[in-house]
Amino acid sequence: MTAVDGTGAAGTSAAEALAERLFAATLGASELQSVYLGDRLGWYRALSDHGPLTSTELADRTGTVERYAREWREQQAVAGYVDVNSDADRRYSLPQAHADVLVDDENLLFLAPLARLFVATTSSMPRLLDAYRHGGGVTWESMGPDAREGQAVLNRPMYLHQLCQQFLPVVTDLHATLSDGGQVADLGMGEGWSSIALALGYPKIEVHGFDVDAASVNAARRNAHDRGVDDRVHFSLVDVAGQAPEAGRADAGTYDAVFAFECLHDVPDPVGFLSTARAIAQPGAPVIVMDERTADEFDPEAGPIEQLLYGFSLTCCLPDSLSHPGSIATGTVMRHSTLESYAKAAGFERVDVLPIEHEMFRFYRLG
């Protein structure tokens, strides 16, 4: 086992330990690429639904080339992702436990979309290098559907199966408000799964979602229609910060609750964004922000979650934010104190951490 500081087992030099760590990272990166292929080409789903399969059967079912399918399934067997029998034709299958992670897109363990996110950011490396050297950034839109869809489907199980079932009921007054019905705003909703989950969990509310990405808004409308809630869930292409009302109009708010799920750290103007949230909320209405569960302050020993967040910040969140002139450039690792400073600049008096437990996210109530 190689530690973060580069030290390894007894008798291993720091250089050897770091070399081992980079080799392990290379294996991990290679596996993510193979997971991307299996996800996007439908190979995992075919093995899950119809396995065991030979490479010819796998290729035929997915409309792919047998030679590539054969190489991929052998790599997957060597990596331990799929099982292979000992027969001469070597049929391969996907264990159910692995299907939970790689195929079942509503399972809380579904992590295949991580590969899409990494492929999206890796394909942006030439533009990232240019931005790092000369300034500017790389827009979320330019990272393509792998970034947009990967982010959306990665969070979907949590929204659909935990948000209204476990998380929001903890906030008793908010739960009561939503149960009674009313108007709800979902700012920066992406492909709309948070809005859809709110509507499914609280059948009396009407949800208005807002986002700056046209492709996300269009996808959100399709998703709401497919889930049968498009009569109560509506999406608009709006720059929330750019549309912030004057301070004097804050009391004219129309929403009984306002949410912002995992988007504030990406926003170029978080103070303007939160000013809008405050303005459109009715007096005393809850404004809820869900964002990354970061440490309270910078700590080199913060652990793997913070390592992952910094990785996303380097290649995705910070470059997207910096692609907008005048961006405050928060980055993925937005700490409690940073959010609090934005909220107070936007006119809020307090920021409370809600007693909702999640490994990746923290929920804040602004008031």
Can you say where each PLM-predicted feature lies in the sequence?
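A short glycine-rich, Lys/Arg-flanked "PGG" loop and its adjoining helix->strand segment in the class I
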Residues: 271-283
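Short amphipathic alpha-helical interaction segments
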Residues: 64-75
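Conserved adenosyl
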Residues: 122-272
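Core SAM-dependent methyltransferase catalytic element
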Residues: 347-367
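C-terminal alpha-helical "lid/dimerization" subdomain adjacent to the S-adenosyl-L-methionine
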Residues: 290-346, 352
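Short glycine-centered segments of the SAM/dcSAM-binding site in methyltransferase folds
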Residues: 183, 285-286
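Conserved Class I S-adenosyl-L-methionine-dependent methyltransferase catalytic core
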Residues: 25-40, 46, 75-182
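A short acidic, leucine-rich amphipathic alpha-helix
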Residues: 55-61
